[in-house]
Amino acid sequence: MESRPALSPNWPAGELEGVWRWSPDPQRRREAALLLASADRDGAAGQGNWLAAQGWGPDPLAAVALKREALRRELEAGREKALPLWRTLLRRFPDQPASADALYALGRQRPEWRQELLRRFPAHPAALAAALEAGPGEAERRLGTLHLARWGPRWPGAGEAITALCSNRTLSPSSLAQLAQGLAEAGDGQGALRCLGDQGGEGPIGEALSDRGRLALGRTWLKGTPDAQAKASRTLLKVVERRPDGPEAEEAVRLLSERDSADVPALLRSLPPRWRNSAPVQARLALTESGVSSTLAVLRRWPQDPASWDLQWEAARRALLAGDWEGVVTILQTLPAEQLPPALAARHRFWLGYAQRELGQEEEAILTWKGLLVHHPGGYYGWRASARLGKEDLSPRGGPSGQALQASHSRWEPLASGERALDQLWRLGQPTEAWESWRVRRGGQPPTTSADLLVEGRLRQGVGDDWTGLSQLEKASLILPPERCGHLPRLERALHPLRFLDAFAPEAERHQLALPLLLGVTKQESRFTPAVQSSAGAVGLMQLMPETAAELAGGPLTLQRLRDPHLNVKLGAQYLSNLLDQWKGDPLAAVASYNAGPGAVQGWKTPDRARFPELWVEAIPYPETRLYVKKVLGNAWSYQRERTPAC
């Protein structure tokens, strides 16, 4: 049979409708119907026209069509009218993720089906919603909250429910330990500590923690106060001592090695020999020693370990700030860029070229930077290499319009997960179904490999969760193996989505700001999530402090108003434009001021910014601001125009 091009969201609606009406292949007609329904702008009624009678046959797509039709009927005719469709879906496809929604809907009348939902599809969003709604009795609510703590502690409303149940000290130690672990996995270290009780994890509740629970607590407490960090060290050390050969021990050792405290070297030297002689421990100890011999030994022994990659950069940064350019070259050449994840290889190549130029090796520097622009043309180091070579530069004012950016980002791209069913759902414009299938398959476990991070990050973007999705894509870029560089173009595009252009484009034009710079700031500030509020009180897309916003607006604003994307962007663009004016158009100082404040930037005793901009950035005394400047301006450079990396 003649092969036909696969249907996808890239097909024009008119052509899809032609397939839906006239194709002799019923499967192809159903695929067209799903695509048309996903893009239908006429609401539920239009979707019904496309999907009517598409629930035939044993193919899992029939389950999706039945679910969509049942949801449409609920919306149009009420829940009662949809019940026959839900029953049909559950009877014909009991093991398909779509049946979780059937159990949820049918469970409104028969609570035992809600329990069946929690048992069969524990990580499915429908199960998490059912767990949050569990009741009316206290026992049902307790079981629902414990389910959330185990399977979905980040589900909206789960944190409040878990915190409330933690106050019930009649629960068993194992139940309280599960609740504390859930809060830790959701990032609430203080709440987890309160849940553990007065003994803070040292008593019966702490003993009931699993190693995974201790890892979650340690990971969260390491981000807290010095006391919390010390508690994290004790908790992580217990993981290593209890099961030194267990799968959690390695991550515990890595987390212990990352803590920035004077007592860490002694603690690491007390570990069992297996871990004392591991890459993360030896890399951390090498940073405490004078000279570079220990550093070079670690790089040669463990070239593929992330701890070696971090060590190489920390040692090279110390050398470049000291002006030891021969030392920089030695450190960087010991572990070549070709062995690093592409995002780290870009940094490696830039500073190798910089050191070569400082040593008078002009031709070598030019070749190094040209190679960087071939393999890593986007991001901060792509910008700096381009500027150093006298090529294109970053434009803080002007630049491409919203329409031009939209045209370059408009095409749908395959998920390329390697799983046929998942890729098919994505291709047919069903990101929610794809995401739910992924959750069910993985049991809600967080991804750890670059491949899984890339897939889950894009799936989360597909369901509107840029906050977590972009974070996962960033992590994927930092551990992507060099041999998987073919994924880079897709990853780069996913890392730079276009959001809220109707808010950004007019303000960029009004203030003569580069739209890519506005997008770059916002991506780093909030990951395009309007509801975000920082621990310091910054609010909305561009993370404005209420006091700053009130000054810009000419009066106080409620938090609700400040979360409005259009108002937030209007005030944020005005503030950024003011900073650019204050710093005479210098994007480095303006962006640093957006993060740390112009007063702080004014007081830094750093290298001459005009002559040594890259050294000025590396000498910023605040690590957060140092990273922020590179991220924001790298984002802006990548948004300025599409830059396709090569393997």
Segments the model singles out, each with a brief description of its role:
Residues E251, P265, S270, A279-R284, ...:
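Catalytic glycan-binding domains that act on GlcNAc-containing polysaccharides
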Residues D40, R73-E74, R110, L183, ...:
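Residue at a conserved register position within TPR or TPR-like alpha-solenoid repeats
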Residues L118-P125, G135-P136, R142-G152, V240-E241, ...:
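TPR/TPR-like (Sel1-like) alpha-helical repeat modules
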Residues P12, A44-G46, A82, A192, ...:
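Single-residue signature of alpha-solenoid repeat helices
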Residues A44, A77, G187, T225-D227, ...:
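Residue-level detector of the short coil/turn that links helix A to helix B
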Residues M1-E2, P9-A13, S23-A33, G43-G46, ...:
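Generic helix N-cap/helix-start motif at coil->alpha-helix transitions
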Residues E15, Q47-N49, L85, W113, ...:
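Alpha-helical solenoid repeat scaffolds, predominantly canonical TPR units
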Residues G18, T88, E116, D198, ...:
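The canonical alpha-helical register within tetratricopeptide repeats
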